[in-house]
Amino acid sequence: MVSFSYLLLACSAIGALAAPVEPETTSFNETALHEFAERAGTPSSTGWNNGYYYSFWTDGGGDVTYTNGAGGSYSVNWRNVGNFVGGKGWNPGSARTINYGGSFNPSGNGYLAVYGWTTNPLIEYYVVESYGTYNPGSGGTFRGTVNTDGGTYNIYTAVRYNAPSIEGTKTFTQYWSVRTSKRTGGTVTMANHFNAWSRLGMNLGTHNYQIVATEGYQSSGSASITVY
């Protein structure tokens, strides 16, 4: 995921550099209408809603609609998306105990996870509670396991090169805890994951935001989640 402010700055710079020497006129034809429809949905944004921090980011592909609800609730529906991540939680993150519940129905690749970032070092982390057709741990390096909250989580690390982050395009490490028995509600004791990661030399930095997120990648689906 990437910060919304960085995207706005990048888009402004791209627009300035790409301005044509001579003005062009285009008609709003069927092709333009089709392209607009493919990119329909909720724009990227962050902020506070009903006492919870929310973050929603999309690469603009496909159709994804994110809606904040009462309290810690949100819903998201997506169809043929590129990539998006959205949810509600806190800013800054911490080793808190999180309770959540709801529904998560991906058709294809998607994750339901506690998701957050730290800086110094720049770390993107996931505690995955459920996923669709792709186990995100399969692309990483297995580091160990942690037993907590009635289940076993496999721990992985991965490196993202020149990828979007909360600090712009950077190379950074991802930390993953992936639950072996999927669920869509319960308690997540973040202190247990952070301590397990630390014992494996996987250190975190200064916490940025931390949300219970739904992520979709080249897929369709729906989710309705409440954070307590």
Swiss-Prot record:
Location of this chain's protein in the cell: Secreted
Lineage: Eukaryota, Fungi, Dikarya, Ascomycota, Pezizomycotina
Temperature dependence: Optimum temperature is 60 degrees Celsius. Around 53 percent activity is retained at 70 degrees Celsius. Stable from 30 to 60 degrees Celsius with maximum stability at 30 degrees Celsius.
Coiled-coil intervals: none
Single Gene Ontology BP annotation: xylan catabolic process
Protein name per Swiss-Prot or TrEMBL: Endo-1,4-beta-xylanase xynf11a
Family as reported in the entry's similarity comment: Belongs to the glycosyl hydrolase 11 (cellulase G) family.
Catalytic residues identified in the record: 124 (nucleophile), 215 (proton donor)
E.C. code: 3.2.1.8
Domain of life: Eukaryota
Limits of the GH11 domain: 40-228
Stored PANTHER family: ENDO-1,4-BETA-XYLANASE A-RELATED
Chief place of localization: secreted
Glycosylation sites noted in the Swiss-Prot or TrEMBL record: 29
Name of the gene this protein is made from: xlnA
Signal peptide feature range: 1-18
A GO CC term assigned to this protein in UniProt: extracellular region
